[in-house]
Amino acid sequence: MHDPHSDRMSAGETRAAASLALVFAFRMLGMFMVLPVLATYGTDLAGATPALIGLAIGAYGLTQAALQIPFGVISDRIGRLPVIYFGLLVFAAGAALAANADSIWGVIAGRVLQGAGAISAAVMALLSDLTREQHRTKAMAMIGMSIGLSFAVAMVVGPLLTRAFGLSGLFWATAGMALLGMLIVAVAVPRASRSLQHRESGVARQALLPTLRNGELLRLNLGIGVLHAILMASFVALPLALVDEGGLAKEEHWWVYLSALLIGFFGMVPFIIYGEKKRRMKRVLCGAVL
């Protein structure tokens, strides 16, 4: 038995946070690896146009956004694990569909199906079930770090895998990562000793519409939406610009992304330290946007 008021995470909490962070990392790694390569390698697909390639890149977000809340509600009723298993299986099926596609429409269909495996809400809810309230922020920070790391790794590994195995091989690797995530859930994620119904979950369902209309949240959601739109648009335009304007072969794009990530990471550290010490993170954020 662990002390419910302990300042340290218990072994079970650490295991839960680490294993769920790993599940998130493998899923997001598979999702992110496609971004830097689809615009260039996707031109070989039948019917491919810049607009349809852009749709293929961002299509997963449509179904993911639509199903995130329903999957979370379903996980409250039938349990977190069945929803997570199902979501990862759907994600793997979408990757397999895209891997076997000969046309851009097949890839779009696969990406839409991938997005339908919207397990983020269920994973975060399971994390809440397995951690005490005072340690929840640390556990969620571990998941946030895993997502950031998976993005950085994907920018390098995605182009390298595609160069070696083609776009089809990349999607098969993505499917394998989803299945590996299912294995991690089966063998590493602790089981909750009892079904926990968080009071805040019930309140959130009752106040769903007022929450969606909240002005502060609307501004936050709009800002995040614009940020993601710019990111997706960048991966439509930048790879093609590197080929057409920069004369850089698509097989060599990985080192451009690696260099940009390293410069961005080490360049931001002093500003983050400054913002934390001077309590001017808003100013730092605005400067980063500019």
Residue locations for each model-derived region?
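Helix-to-loop junctions at the C-terminal end of transmembrane segments
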Residues: 68-78, 266-280
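Juxtamembrane intracellular "pre-TM" segments in multi-pass secondary transporters
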Residues: 2-14, 190-223
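Cytoplasmic membrane-interface "Motif A"-like loop-to-helix N-cap segments
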Residues: 77-87, 276-289
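Cytoplasmic helix-loop-helix junction between adjacent transmembrane helices
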Residues: 109-148
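C-terminal membrane-cytosol helix-exit motif in multi-pass small-molecule transporters
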Residues: 176-195
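Conserved MFS/SLC helix-loop-helix module at the cytosolic interface between two early adjacent transmembrane helices
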Residues: 66-102
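Residue-level signature of mid-helix packing/kink "hotspots" within the transmembrane helices
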Residues: 61-69, 151-152, 261-269
